[in-house]
Amino acid sequence: MKTAVLLLSYGSPEKMSDIDEYLSKIFGGKPVPKGVAEENYRKYEMFGGLSPSNRIIQSIRDRLQKRFDQSGDVDVFTAFKHWYPSIGEVVPDLKGYDNIVSIPLFSFFSENVKASYYKPLAEALEKNDIRTKMEFVNGISNYDLFIPMWIHLIEEKEKGDSFYLFDAHSLPHPENEEDYLFWLRYSTYKITQIMGLRSSDFGFQGGHEGWLGPSIYNVYRKAKEKKIIAVPISFLYDHLEILYDLDYEFRKKIEEDGYSYERVPMPNDSAIFITLLERIVSSSITHLSGELIGNGKEKSENFI
């Protein structure tokens, strides 16, 4: 039985001259607001015109592939929602596989995230007449290694008198995101209990009016401690929302208010994260029970 593993992620431009096309994809071909374009140019210029995210995801793919090379029955692919190779470009390569395991690289179960990746994936599968059993893994926080992975990362920055700010991406339609909130709260609670972190809370970044809150810009003000340690628990790899929005913008603000800032490392292509993905793939293959994909039929989800 041959299985295709599809790692799904947002994608990012490879150089400054790619930014206009990248933003056009995000806005679905509609005009990009001038302020948004200027902000993105400013961000990418700070990092030499390149986010590290595509390189990290390729390394994740390569390292995960090595875990399955000996068996020879699993091939790992990457596809981006807003860059190349796109989901539509990669799906034709999935012909001939008995199973597909699709994993958006996002920590928590989310209706918004699920829809944003599953819809173009299902459309591409139908367009290419691929009718294969598929497991769509909506969130990875319900797997055993998720919490130990974050504990390991936090221990690298653990300092006694600190406020631990667990940071998650805000999402629209909060009425549909009860499970997202549950897994965020549950994971934060388990980590703080196991580690004995006395001062912590969670907040959201990147939101708009009516999205999930509270904002991290409101939460840090609760801290009695003057050292803030950010734990971006809903993210899995370095990209500009981490390197710019947190490490530059947020840091600048809290330092102006007299706080110091540190951030725990991201999972990226670490051995423990690759092991977590390996276990997800192996588990999905073992109990794969999705309906045939095609002609609008539903998929299976691996979710407790």
UniProtKB/Swiss-Prot annotation:
Keyword Transport belongs to the record: no
CDD domains membership: Ferrochelatase_C, Ferrochelatase_N
SUPFAM superfamilies for this protein: Chelatase
GO terms for biological process, alphabetical: heme biosynthetic process
GO-annotated cellular components: cytoplasm
Known EC number: 4.98.1.1
UniProt catalytic activity: heme b + 2 H(+) = protoporphyrin IX + Fe(2+)
GO MF, any single term: metal ion binding
Keywords, sorted A to Z: Cytoplasm, Heme biosynthesis, Iron, Lyase, Metal-binding, Porphyrin biosynthesis
Binding positions (Fe cation): 169, 241
UniProt keyword Metal-binding present: yes
Pfam family, one: Ferrochelatase
Subcellular location: Cytoplasm
Source organism, top-level taxon: Archaea
Pathway: Porphyrin-containing compound metabolism; protoheme biosynthesis; protoheme from protoporphyrin-IX: step 1/1
Family, similarity comment: Belongs to the ferrochelatase family.
HAMAP family according to UniProt: Ferrochelatase (MF_00323)
Job of this protein: Catalyzes the ferrous insertion into protoporphyrin IX.
Descriptive protein name: Ferrochelatase
Gene name of this polypeptide: hemH
